[in-house]
Amino acid sequence: MSSDVEQPVTARTSERGAATRTALLKAAKEVFVSKGFAEAGVTDVVGRAEASVGSLYHHFSGKADLYLTLFEEFQAKQAQRTSQAAREARAEGESDPMKVFIRAARAYLDGCLEEREVAALFLRGDGPPGFEVVMRDRLRKWAERNAALFDDDEGALVVVITGALAAAVSEVVRTGDRDLAEDVLAIIGQIRPAASATGAANG
């Protein structure tokens, strides 16, 4: 009989815990965006979330953990956007890897514009200690995913387009300029492997 009583109590407790965690992340995002990571304090976050310091440390190890969780959640959404765009392109019969890449890149930039304040937060250079290592690792994994679209001998092409898109992300997020995003994608879409470019020039 006790399990019949305990199960709904446990469920309610779990729901409250999830709601508190969500509120803390929402508050952390707002505080970090408005004050920056360095100037933000745990008390700012719990005050905005109307939660206790104890509840924050129940869910997170501290301010840096909040920041990194926000980053990982944003990147997960971005990965979902780009994967869906690539799948849709292939489902429509697109076989040119560069065109598939551009579709995915557009989805990534659209996500940055839709959540511009959050995207800008991670480009400020104001993250927790060691965040630059996290960003470098993320860029490396991004390049690996891009490489999967192309032939094995097109490594140089992958380096160029990944670097170009990374630079475009920073500028598009800074300006909020959707036309700039489209112009950059149009230019990147014209880039071809060295062998192809040489052949075109000789032709």
Predicted regions: what they are:
Residues D4, V100, A107-D110, D153-R192:
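Hydrophobic alpha-helical segments that form the core
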Residues A23-V31, K77, R103, A107:
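Pre-recognition alpha-helix immediately N-terminal to the DNA-recognition helix
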Residues M1-A19, A89, S196-G203:
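N-terminal intrinsically disordered/low-complexity leader segments
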Residues A79, S83, R103, D110, ...:
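Amphipathic alpha-helical packing segments from all-alpha helical-bundle domains
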Residues T69, S83-E114, L157, I161, ...:
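Hydrophobic alpha-helical connector segments
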Residues A19, A23, A27-D65, T69:
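Helix-turn-helix
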Residues E72-Q78:
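Short, basic, alpha-helical segments at the C-terminal edge of helix-turn-helix-like DNA-binding modules
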Residues R103, A107-V133, G163, S170-E171:
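Amphipathic alpha-helical segments used for helix-helix packing
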